[in-house]
Structures are given as C-alpha cells and as structure tokens.
Amino acid sequence: MGDIENPWHSRPIDVHRWSDHPEVAGLCDRIWDGYLPSDQTSGPKPKTAFRHQLRVLVLDLYVAWLEDPELCIGVSMSSNYWDTTSRYNALHISKKIIPIIHALDHAGLLDLAKGSFSGPFVRGNRTTRIRASEVLRGWFAEVTFQRDDIGRATGEELIILRDTEEGLVEYDDTDQTIRMREELRRYNEVIAHAFIDIPVLDAPRVDDVAIDRYHERTRRIFSRSDWGMNGRFYGGWWQSLNSDWRSRIFINDTPVVEVDFRGLHVSLLSLEAGVELDGDPYEVSERLLGGVPTQLQRSLIKKLVLTAINAGSKDSAFKSLRDGFPTGHAGKTLTNEQLERLLAAFLERSPHLEDQLFKDQGIRLMNLDGQISEWVHRHFSDQGVPVLSVHDSYLIDYTRVGELKRVMAFASERVCGAALPTSNEFFGLDEVDPTAEHVQDYVTWRQTPRSEGYLQRLAEHERRIGRAVEPFTLT
C-alpha cells in the first residue's frame, strides 16, 4: 500500500455510479470472493445488496483513477452518516460500506489516510481518504470496459438543500420542488444530447478542468436550509473556466457567444433601491493605486464590491479578498487603506449602495439570479436548444444571441420587475443582416481549426446519439 501524501487532493465519494457491464460485475465478484465474507448475513435484507455496494465503490475508485491516479475519494467512516432512506442516496448505500472499505484496505487494494477530527467546525477536520492501490490500479489497467460503460443511478437527486455547514438536508417534496426537478431533468437531457467541446483542445482538459460529457450534469443547490437562499445551478465544466476559454467553446460544432448581465448583483441592489445604474459601476476616472493599470484597478474594484456584498463584515471582506488572490498578484498585498480608497471611489459613483455592503446579501441575491436562470433554461429546453449558464451569464450558439438577450430581459423583468442590462463581446448572427459583407468575415473569423482529438470526440458523440451533428453554415 502506498502513502497518501496529500489527502486534500480529493473529492467526495460519488454513490451514484453504476454499470451492468459483465466485466464490471466480474471484477467485483473477483474482489468479493477473494477478500470479503459471504453476504449471507442475519438481520433484515438490505435495500441494496452488499455486492452491489462494493460495485459502486469500485466504480468510483476506477473513475477517480482514470481522472488522476493521485486523486483521493473522501468517505465517512461513521455509521450514522449512511442513511439508506435519504433522498440523496438513490442506491441506498448503507453502513455496510465501512467494513467493505476496511476489508479492501486490509487486502492491500486501497491506499487509505484516516480521517481527522479536532473538534466541531475545526478547519483541519476531514473524512477518511481512499484511492486504488498499485495492486488495484494494475487490475484496472487490464480491464476492457471503458468510461462510457459507467453510468449514473436512476433517481439521483438534482434539487439539493444544504444547511449552514453545507450538510445535506432532507425535505418533503412540494409542487415547487417537483416542478424544479422535472425542468432540470429536461435541461440535463438537452445538454446530454448536445456536443459541447473546445475545438483547439487535442486532449479534453484545461489545467485541472476535464472538458467532457461526464462533467456536464447540472444540479440546483439551495443553502442554509432555506429555499429563499442560493438556488443557483451548478455542475457544468464551463463554469470552471475563465471567460477567455469559455469564448472558445463550440456547441454542436458551432461557435458560441456569451451574454452577461452587467454588474448583476449591483444592478439588483440598485433596482431594489429605485436607482438606475449609469454606465459601468466599477469604472472610476482616476488611478487610485500607483503603478496599477486602469483595467486591473477596475477588476480589483469589482472583486472588492462583490466580496463586500457577500461578506458579513468589512474585516472579513478585506481578508477574504486578499486570500482569494495567488501569491504574486497585486491584490494579495493590498492594505486596508488601499481597499478603503477603492471602496470610497465606488461608493462615490453609487452612494445608494453604501448601506447594502457587508450585510451578507449575496446568498439572497443568488436566489434571484437562480430564478432568472430557471426562466432561461425553461425557454430553451422547450425548444431542445442547449444554453450554458454561468450564474450571471449564458452561452449559446451564435445564431441565437438576439433571442437569448430577449429571454434574459423577459426573465429578469418577471423575477425583478425590470429588464436588467446585458452585454456581449461578440455579436449574434440573428442580430445583424446575414447578407452584409462583414458578417461573412465574422463567420470566417469565428471558425476555429479543429484538433484531431476534437474530431475524434465529435465522431464518438455522433456514434453515441445515432445521428450527425449539423453545425451552422452561412448560405
């Protein structure tokens, strides 16, 4: 067994992996028969057979190994954690998984780092970490089943309610949660049938972000045990990329345009105060920090204001801002005095927001933008058209940008009482005269060389869905 040098390089166990592939069943039978006791035990029959619980565990270890051999899985070793009746446990994984993990560890099939607990809410607390050992990795390397042979359990919960400590909260369904779940299921179905990729990537990865269909499933998460807090949509890999990489995404082999709400949370707070924003709220006329370029200064002001909207106090906001920058970034060493100067310049332009900062407003405002996204998703899902949401912006293929902007205006008016301002760097083909000469130049310019890896992934997608992807062509 190897040592786990960095137990923080991990993700939580995914208890919704499943596969009926015969080789998967054979591998799990080999492990069970060789290292685990008979599943003929006394007591009530489990909702999910113990061998099936082993299969879920082995599949998640296999997926983690494929993504990164050093990646660990965080798993609770407390019997109280495993609730077979939970709505977040569709396969009814039970506390039996704990002795299964112990048996695999004893057999040398796992690398394991025990969890640590120093007291309630201590930052260093963590669950036990596991990953496939060299022995199990060797077995994984010999199998012929592939990532595509591993799916997800039917009935996996998409509407998540968390408490203040990010723990999962059980709830009873209402007409609202049933509607939200069905709409999100339809949205995920539209996304699953679309080919969403980046043509310049030969290998489907940007830094630590996997660009593939296995990281496209979206969930909706509410916070603080309150359906009025958060409610944003999370999950698509595009949410983890910066705007430059997002601009290179193609949907169904067609370039995209990203449309964003300008200063969304500032706009929402201004609307609530009865004030109409004039121009860019983050731009100030003078350079406030010596040696800092104007564009970087704007970026710092924007990050400071958004942090101040989310924070409960000025001290926590300033600390959080600095902590969010990497070593060497200009923002890392900003003093409180400099931050006060930036904040004062912002408030000089938007004095109506002074009483709205440092009041923990962000989580409430997220609920409003989540409702807006719900309207946007619904409109395009009804047409079978994929649209990618990034909380305050949306990406769509460049033939539907004007339509997207109209839907965003409609949605924000329904939710907030007024159409919020939007902006987009690139224009949509439905916003211009398609016969204009510059439009052909634009279409040509947006066409990106396709890498060999991209073309292979496109062909695999077409085989999987049983039809050809038809990109837009200007006639």
Where is each model-derived feature located?
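Short alpha-helical segments that sit at the start of domains
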Residues: 2-73, 363-364
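C-terminal polymerase-core module
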Residues: 312-317, 401-475
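Catalytic palm active-site di-aspartate
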Residues: 260-261, 386-398
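A short, conserved structural fragment
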Residues: 101-119, 384-388
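Adenine-nucleotide phosphate-binding core of ATP-dependent small-molecule kinases
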Residues: 355-372
